[in-house]
């Protein structure tokens, strides 16, 4: 009798486990979608001005708001100042998923 009870509990736990994993993967995908403002336009505005090395500044901002795999590819960015202390970063050779 104990064996049957243990078997049933194990079956119930294993049936709940995969559904819990799929919900976790789904929420992780939503977080990644929120962190990816760069695609498809590959342009992003920020509330600051371009520094002396604006291209590096844009790349640092890209890395902080994008997937860490960006570091594995060669990305070059262009920084352009806009009125009211805004800057536009354009990274045209960035690979979008």
UniProtKB/Swiss-Prot annotation:
Top-level division of the source organism's lineage: Eukaryota
InterPro entries with a match to the protein in the record: SCRL
Signal peptide (residue range): 1-24
Compartments, as annotated in UniProt: Secreted
One GO cellular component, as annotated: extracellular region
Pfam families, alphabetized: SCRL
Record-level GO BP terms: defense response to fungus; killing of cells of another organism; signal transduction
Expressed in which tissues: Flower buds and stems.
Disulfide bonds: 39-96, 50-79, 58-89, 77-91
Keywords: Antimicrobial, Disulfide bond, Fungicide, Plant defense, Secreted, Signal
Family statement: Belongs to the DEFL family.
Name this protein carries in UniProt: Defensin-like protein 246
Originating organism: Arabidopsis thaliana
Lineage: Eukaryota, Viridiplantae, Streptophyta, Embryophyta, Tracheophyta
């Amino acid at each position: 009798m104990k064996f049957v009870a243990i078997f049933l509990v194990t079956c119930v736990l294993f049936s709940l486990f995969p559904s819990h994993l799929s919900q976790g993967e789904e929420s992780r995908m939503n977080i990644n979608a929120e962190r990816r403002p760069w695609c498809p336009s590959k342009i992003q505005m920020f509330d600051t001005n371009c520094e002396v090395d604006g291209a590096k500044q844009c790349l640092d901002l890209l890395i902080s708001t994008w997937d860490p795999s960006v570091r594995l590819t060669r990305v070059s960015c262009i920084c352009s100042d806009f009125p009211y202390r805004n800057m536009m970063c354009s990274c045209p050779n960035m690979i979008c998923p």
